[in-house]
Regions:
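Short, hydrophobic secondary-structure boundary micro-motifs
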Residues: 30-31, 51-54, 94
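Short proline/glycine- and basic residue-enriched helix-capping loop/turn segments at helix->loop/beta transitions
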Residues: 44
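Arg/Lys-rich, positively charged N-terminal/basic patches that mediate binding to nucleic acids
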Residues: 1-33
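Conserved protein kinase catalytic domain
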Residues: 11, 18, 37-40, 83-86
Length: 106
């Protein structure tokens, strides 16, 4: 069973998205956060269940999609690092994702 490790930037991303949604609908924001954490928790048993992002062919990253968000992660042994959470309608900045990965052990 893999261990989930949320990075601080990924948690900040999720907080910012939830805060924005909560301006109009606090219940929807809470539900989104709950769904994302539940979806991420499934990775402990099925770490390769996330898809390979089409923009990142050949890279080691995977994603899970819990609309309106995409959650990017990578597996390293028995750990899964949650690196980046973004709105699904935005374009992925690959350099931004790679920069976040520099503080995570290989």
């Amino acid at each position: 069973m893999a261990e989930i490790v949320w990075t601080e930037p990924a948690l900040s991303d999720l907080d910012a998205i939830a805060d924005y949604i909560a301006l109009d609908n606090p219940e929807a924001a809470q539900q989104l956060v709950r769904r994302i954490f539940q979806h991420v928790e499934q990775l402990t048993d099925y770490p390769k269940s996330g898809s390979k992002p089409p923009e990142l062919k050949g890279w080691r990253y995977r994603q899970i999609v819990e609309l309106p968000c995409r959650v990017f992660y990578r597996q390293d042994g028995d750990r899964i690092y949650i690196l980046y959470v973004m709105r699904a309608e935005r374009l992925l900045d690959m350099a931004h994702l790679a920069t976040r990965d520099t503080n995570v052990p290989e």
